[in-house]
Amino acid sequence: MTTPEILIYHHPDPQSSLLPLLRAHLPHSVPLLRRIQHGLAYPSPTAAVLATFPATTTLPSTTEPWLAAHVDLFRGRETQIYIYSSLEREASSPPASAAGVDSDFVSTFGDRISMDKQARTRDQLLAFLAYVKANLLPEYLSSPKAAAAADNPPSPSPSTPGTGSGTGTPVKKIPPPPPTAFLIGSMHTGLATLLTASGTDYSDPQTLPGVRIIRRDDPPYVKYLFRPEAYRLPSTGTDNDNTTSDKDKDRDEAPERRRHPLPPGYRFHDRRGRYGVQPHHHALVSSRTHIPRSSETLARMPGVAVYYDGDDKPNPNSSQTHDGLEGEEEMPIAWAFLGVDGSLATLHVEPAHRGRGIGACVSREAMRSGFRAGGIFRSRSRSRSLGEEEGEGEGEGELGHTDVLVTNRASRRVMEKLGGEIGWTDTWVVVELEG
């Protein structure tokens, strides 16, 4: 029997042609679903949504594996590709003995999925990478941004007081991938394993012929899922506590009626009443993380900041502006964002304020605010196949997630105390096709 040729198709209107299908694959498809939703809110002329099936009214076969991805190589040092395979829904979940912080595991496709399906998915993955290399990479390589990302990485120590983890030591940034390689984010470890020679061992150092894995997370990350109940405010029975007024929906700085409670002396707004992370905070935020993100990216990530005045003493950053002038702008002592894939990201609490439950408060508030009605991750779509408006089911539009390194026991305990449920393992991979 002849194996059908694998073709890669553009989806110029993914809201109609792809989002309904990805919603049907939740929670497994949540990183790609959220990345596409973010791209719809903030369109990029260099981004493409691709799949192994055409953007028509016909959905792919339920028995034939399929693959879809969001690609923007021009993000350079930041994650360039988010990819989802339908096999991920069938992949192994952590066994009951590994469903906690004291056990390590790696999600694989294993024996539950036929070798024929795995081989087909591997071929789809290779065809996708080859398509990106042949059709999208040349434009990126000819741009100034490719050279800048490789030769001029951003400084690990922006001119912000107290850089690093509260010790004055700059946080070293993750090195940029080579311009000819692709940085794939939140990639299911089962899918990444298909690029190894064994096809079954995630840690196998040998790769398929013509494939070079430059970097991957070993051990990988644990994907935690957050149902709305994990971060919603308790109902008072007086009004809809999880919505904002029409006036507030388009004003990130507008105080909302209710927020998650903070310890005494802490607040979610600065002294001017502004809610959320402000542009002059970006240098401080960047200085505290090893993940390179531009100010433009941070501005497009829903974020929440916490300020402190409990002992009537200014925090070390509160009297500084982003340009060093005195007394104009107050700086936060904690913050959290939802990334471009909707994941809880860049969570940070300054060392002097840790151990007070602030991390949990700012995490819940970031998800509550980021998944509010009318937000970028709560868009509805019109399904061509159904011919009617297709929105998320109850709670699906508010499904949150995050990634924690398998060996980071402390952070995993925090996520599980927040109500996070272990889903699978994933990784950030830098891969290059040779030849």
Role assignments for model-derived ranges:
Residues 292-312, 318-352:
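A conserved beta-strand-loop-helix scaffold within acyl/acetyltransferase catalytic domains
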Residues 34-272, 427-434:
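Acyl-donor-binding surface of acyltransferase catalytic domains
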